[in-house]
Amino acid sequence: MENKNTENISLESKLYTAEEVATILGVSKTTAYREIKRLNAELEAQGYITITGKISKRFFNERAYF
């Protein structure tokens, strides 16, 4: 059985936080939360489970223009 801390580290390394998204896009944290919410809605429509305030790095990098 895996250690819960190891599982969290693995999951966290696959997600961006709103603060990280704000830095990447050069926007405020509020705007980053808004964009994460919009992107998470797309993922939910495709049947994925999402975490509020976080976004998959892979999905974000595919969708972001930078």
What are these regions (language model features)?
Residues 9-31:
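Polyanion-binding surface elements
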Residues 7-8, 47:
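Short, functionally important structural connectors and interaction interfaces within domains
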Residues 1-5:
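Short, Lys/Arg-enriched anionic-surface-contact patches
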